[in-house]
Every structure is written in C-alpha cells, then in structure tokens.
C-alpha cells in the first residue's frame, strides 16, 4: 500500500510539473486555419503511384473524412511539384506521380476531384505549387518539357526554371492563373524551394554571366532575391485581378532575419533563435514579402520543439506572429509531426498550438501540419493523435480567418431565404457566389448571442456544384430534438452576414 501511495504521489508531482510547463489552454477561436500538407511528390502522402483512379479517389476521400471529423478546415494539396500537373494543364505534362509515366493521363482530374470533395465537406483547398523545380538528376523529356528545357538553371544535380528569365515569371503566372480560373480553389501556396541550396555566388555560379550582363547595380545575392520577389509580386497581382478572394501565401524555411542589419532594414527585431540559412542559401527573403504586401499569409516551417537549443519553437513562432502582425498579414505556422512514434509526443503539439493562439492576432492565426499521412495513415497512432487534438485544441469547428486588406468589395448584404427543417434536413434557397455557416444552439439560448459562441458552430457549407435552387444540410442526430438552427450567408471573402432561423 505504501508503494502505491508513494507512486501515486510521484505521478501527481510529475503531472503537475508537466502541466506547469504547458501554457494554460485558451478557448478555441472562431476563426483559425487548421490544415495539413498533402504531398504528392515521390508519393509521400498521396496518391499511390500507378494505382487505379478509383483507388486513388477512395484514398483521398478517406483522408478528407478523417480530417473533417476532427475539425480540420483545409488542406494544402500539392498540384505542381516538378513543373508537372495534377490537373488538366495547358502548359505542363501530367505528373508521373499519378501513373508512373510523365505525361500520361490518369483517367480523371485529381484537382477537380479534390476541390469537389473538400467543398462537399465545407473544407477549403489550397493549391500547393512549387514554382521553380524542374527535376533532380533525371531530365524530363515529354513534348511539353521541350520548351522549359531551354530555360533551365543547373546547380549540381538540381535543375530549376531560371528565376532571372522573364519566360519563367510568365510561365509561373500562367500556371497559377490556370489553376485559379479553371478550378474553384480557395488559395495558392508555395513551399520553400527557390534557388538551389548552396548555389555559388562566385564566378563559378551558373548564372554569374547572366547577372553580370543584366546591368544591375545589385549584388548577385540581392539580384537573385529580387528575381524571386518579381515573380511573387506578379502572381499576387494576377490573383487580385482574377479572383481577389483567393488567398496567396508562401511557406518559407522556419528561421529568417537573424541579422541585426537586415532586421533594422525592416524595422523589426531579429529572429531570437536559430540561423537564417535561406537568405544567402536559397535567396529567399520572407520579410520582404510581408513588408511589400506581396502575400496574404506566411506559413513558416517551424519544425522544432519547445526548448530546442538551436531553434526554440517558443521563441521562433511568436516572432513570426509578431512580424506578420506588424505588416498586417497573417502567420499560419507549419508544425512537424513527421516523427510521430508514441502518444507521449502529443502534449508537445498542443502546447505549441497554445503558443500560437496567444501570439497571433485574434482570429488571424492557424496551423498547417506536416504532413497528412501522420494524421490518418499510421494504424492506431494517427487515430489517437486526431482524437487528442480534437479533445484538447480542436474541440469545435472553425472558420477561416478574414483577409480585410482584400475584403473591400461593396455588396448588398445577402439573406438566407426559405430556411426550413424537415426531419434530419435543413434546406434553404441558394445564393449565388456564397457559402454558409450553420449553427445549432439550445432553444433556451438568446438568438442575439448564439453566433458569439464557437461551440454552437456546426461548420461551413458550399453551394452544390450542380446548381439548383436549394441547399441541403444534414443535421447531426443528437441535435434534432432540442436545438434550434440558424444559417448565415458567408461570402467568398469570409464575411458572415445576419442569420436566418428555423421556426
């Protein structure tokens, strides 16, 4: 008995000490990005290369069901990894990661299917694009590759589209325009691949003559960073013209701007932990994109734990939140769960998310998990992780953060008409170019107060693809008898309008 008591006291002490280490939990915000990377390059996450189309579709559906059931609200689907396409492209060949053969039609349009399936579940889909990468070691040689091969920059085994060439900028703009205009994506996102890491800046550099002949007064490093910035600006401007509600962001390496002189240039504090290898390694300057308002959000890959000496999450992540706030932009921090091995790691990620919620502007933050396979594809452990996140930090659904700098289009406030409950179904009249939020709240709750409580939010609904006059929503069984329901119009910018109620 004494041993049991002693063990119980020890366990209580350990748990109390651990609890003191974690930030006190906050109420989940009503608006927060909750996303995951879906990597298609090398078959990292999806699909199984060469599998039949129906099997690939079924796997994506299983993935999305898991995310939706655990209150995620978006995915980042990689649709261009090696100057290829996971969609019907006018410019580039079908990806080999679909069928095993570059240029071979997979029998369906994966991006169109993914957009449809995400929106059926009230989830956003952000098209993840690698802007420059062409290939590694092996040279692609389809008919559509021939033009690109005349505009390559090589360093070691890496081939990329030459960032200095106007042809490259035009190609990337055209690719992004095609994705934005042909597909109902909610966002465009780049990762952290720009110039090849470690590319020389001396006379041995493959673009040394190009820089010399450009007539610029910039150093070769500044010239390279400006080449990247010109491309980023061109894509941002195109999206604003074509579909101004579509978000555009970049996910750079996790540490930037550790130099005091560079921080002074931007009027910010230097990043307090880690080493900025990207500025002179891949010639990426993320703070310039924030300061220049060339992006809507930054999604830094802060893939280190709290207390890690070389780059402490508790120092680096708040710095990104603060820097994004200074320039009136959003920080959606990318967190790594790639080394998921045991349940003992779960509290670390909950603690990291609490740090983000306390440091990002209210309703302006979010998280992207690297990567999705750890959330649904590790037998037993993935399910436990999702249940843990839902129980501790994702207790309720959430909406996407607003982007007020894009949200300047005046429109007459939409109204939900003919809202009815019939058995387990809500129906209402479709409003063109709108989405909807659905709420369920006890009949004792004041109708003027329900929308301020995130716990009453059931989720978001898109208009049906096939049109028609009515929208339908299935009510969860446990809410049908004692709850009343409200539906609010939600425009493509995320503005929520006055509710309509069931009788």
What are the functions of these language-model segments?
Residues 31, 39-58, 126-182, 281:
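Active-site-adjacent "subsite" loops/lids of carbohydrate-active enzymes
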Residues 58-84, 182-183, 288, 294-298:
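Catalytic domains of carbohydrate-active enzymes, especially glycoside hydrolases
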Residues 70-106, 204, 297:
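Aromatic-lined carbohydrate-binding/catalytic grooves of carbohydrate-active enzymes
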Residues 80, 121, 149-294, 303-304:
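Polysaccharide-binding and catalytic clefts of secreted carbohydrate-active enzymes
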Residues 283-309, 320, 324-406:
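Substrate-binding cleft of secreted/luminal carbohydrate-active enzymes
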Residues 391-433, 494-503:
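Pro/Thr/Ser/Gly-rich low-complexity, intrinsically disordered linker/stalk tracts
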Residues 437-480:
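Recognizes extended acidic, P/S/T-rich segments that occur
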Residues 475-497:
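Beta-strand-rich modules
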């Amino acid at each position: 008995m004494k041993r049991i008591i002693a063990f119980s006291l020890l366990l209580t002490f350990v748990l109390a000490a651990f609890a003191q280490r974690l930030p006190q939990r906050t109420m989940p915000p009503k608006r927060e990005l909750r996303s995951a990377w879906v990597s298609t390059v090398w078959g990292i996450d999806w699909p199984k290369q060469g599998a039949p189309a129906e099997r690939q579709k079924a796997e994506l559906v299983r993935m999305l069901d898991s995310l939706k059931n655990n209150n995620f609200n978006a995915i980042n689907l990689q649709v261009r990894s090696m100057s290829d396409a996971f969609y019907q492209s006018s410019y580039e060949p079908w990806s080999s990661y679909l069928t095993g053969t570059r240029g071979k039609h997979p029998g369906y349009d994966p991006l169109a299917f993914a957009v449809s399936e995400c929106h059926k579940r009230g989830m956003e889909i952000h098209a993840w694009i690698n802007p420059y990468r062409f290939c590694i070691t092996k040279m692609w040689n389809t008919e559509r590759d021939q033009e690109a091969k005349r505009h390559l920059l090589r360093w070691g085994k890496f081939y990329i589209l030459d960032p200095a060439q106007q042809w490259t900028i035009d190609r990337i703009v055209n690719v992004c325009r095609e994705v934005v205009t042909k597909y109902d994506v909610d966002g465009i996102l780049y990762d952290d691949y720009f110039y090849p890491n470690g590319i020389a800046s001396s006379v041995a550099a493959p673009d040394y003559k190009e820089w010399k002949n450009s007539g610029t007064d910039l150093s070769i490093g500044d010239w390279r960073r400006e080449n990247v910035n010109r491309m980023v600006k061109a894509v941002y401007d195109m999206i604003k013209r074509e579909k101004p509600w579509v978000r555009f962001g970049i996910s750079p390496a996790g540490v930037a701007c550790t130099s005091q002189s560079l921080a002074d240039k931007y009027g910010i504090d230097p990043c307090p932990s880690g080493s900025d290898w990207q500025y002179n390694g891949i010639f990426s300057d993320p703070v310039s994109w924030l300061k220049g308002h060339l992006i809507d959000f930054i999604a830094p890959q802060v893939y280190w734990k709290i207390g890690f000496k070389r780059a402490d999450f508790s120092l680096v992540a708040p710095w990104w939140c603060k820097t994004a706030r200074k320039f009136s932009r959003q920080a959606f921090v990318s967190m790594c769960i790639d080394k998921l091995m045991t349940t003992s790691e779960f509290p670390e990620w909950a603690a990291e998310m609490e740090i983000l919620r306390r440091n990002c502007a209210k309703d302006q933050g979010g998280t992207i998990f690297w990567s999705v396979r750890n959330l649904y594809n590790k037998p037993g452990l993935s399910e436990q992780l999702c249940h843990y996140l839902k129980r501790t930090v994702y207790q309720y659904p959430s909406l996407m953060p607003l982007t007020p700098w894009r949200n300047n289009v005046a429109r007459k406030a939409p109204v939900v008409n003919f809202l009815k409950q019939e058995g387990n179904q809500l129906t209402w009249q479709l409003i063109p170019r709108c989405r909807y939020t659905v709420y369920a709240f006890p009949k004792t709750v004041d109708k003027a107060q329900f929308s301020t409580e995130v716990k009453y939010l059931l989720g978001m609904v898109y208009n049906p693809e096939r049109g028609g006059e009515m929208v339908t929503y299935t009510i969860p069984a446990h809410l049908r008898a004692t709850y009343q329901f409200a539906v609010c119009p939600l425009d493509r910018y995320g503005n929520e309008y006055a509710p309509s109620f069931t009788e």
